[in-house]
Amino acid sequence: MSLWKVMKLGLIHSAFWTTIQLSVSNMMLRCPTSVFVKYETFFKIWSWEKRGALWNKLFRINKWKHYIPEAAQFNYRIYNKRRLASFKLEDIHFMILEMRRAELVHWLSMIPIVIFIKAPKYILFINVCYVISAKLPIILTQRYNRPRLEHYYQLRMKRDERTCRKRKSSL
């Protein structure tokens, strides 16, 4: 295969995956956050994940996660997940929902790999490698960060409940 053909294929596939990512991302931005509350079981953190610690132990996520670009840099409508707006319960909950959205976007953007099943093996191999290397680190980062934030959120909720009960009982 000529260099020209390889470059042309690379350009076409880059455009394809960029279009897929942007389309899925924009489609999911239109999805109300209430969906991520209603279907929270789809985003359940399993006990064997040990609140995300498993992913950090296996892949040392805390060493490289800061290299992942924040999507909000490219699309102003995307919530910036680098920092919490504040430590208010509503902001923490909103961040958790946006992390669920980010995870789902990356899972959904992997689905089009099926298009390449009938393609020559080297094309399929290259695209599978791309999907795994581009999407899986982000999914794993969400699976590492979100359980920790959810745990913090639950602790804050319990603490706030106790504080409210103490205030009511002292009245």
Swiss-Prot record:
GO biological process: carotenoid biosynthetic process
Transmembrane helix is among the record's keywords: yes
Enzyme class at the top of the EC tree: transferase
Transmembrane recorded as keyword: yes
Protein topology in the membrane: Single-pass membrane protein
One GO cellular component, as annotated: plasma membrane
Highest taxon, organism lineage: Bacteria
Entries under InterPro entries matching the protein: CrtO
Signal peptide: 1-25
EC number, as in UniProt: 2.3.1.-
Keywords, in A-Z order: Acyltransferase, Carotenoid biosynthesis, Cell membrane, Membrane, Signal, Transferase, Transmembrane, Transmembrane helix
Metabolic or biological pathway, per its Swiss-Prot or TrEMBL entry: Carotenoid biosynthesis; staphyloxanthin biosynthesis; staphyloxanthin from farnesyl diphosphate: step 5/5
Stretches that traverse the bilayer: 125-144
Annotated compartments: Cell membrane
Family (UniProt): Belongs to the acyltransferase CrtO family.
Function: Catalyzes the acylation of glycosyl-4,4'-diaponeurosporenoate, i.e. the esterification of glucose at the C6'' position with the carboxyl group of the C(15) fatty acid 12-methyltetradecanoic acid, to yield staphyloxanthin. This is the last step in the biosynthesis of this orange pigment, present in most staphylococci strains.
Designated name of the protein: Glycosyl-4,4'-diaponeurosporenoate acyltransferase
Provenance organism: Staphylococcus haemolyticus (strain JCSC1435)
Gene label: crtO
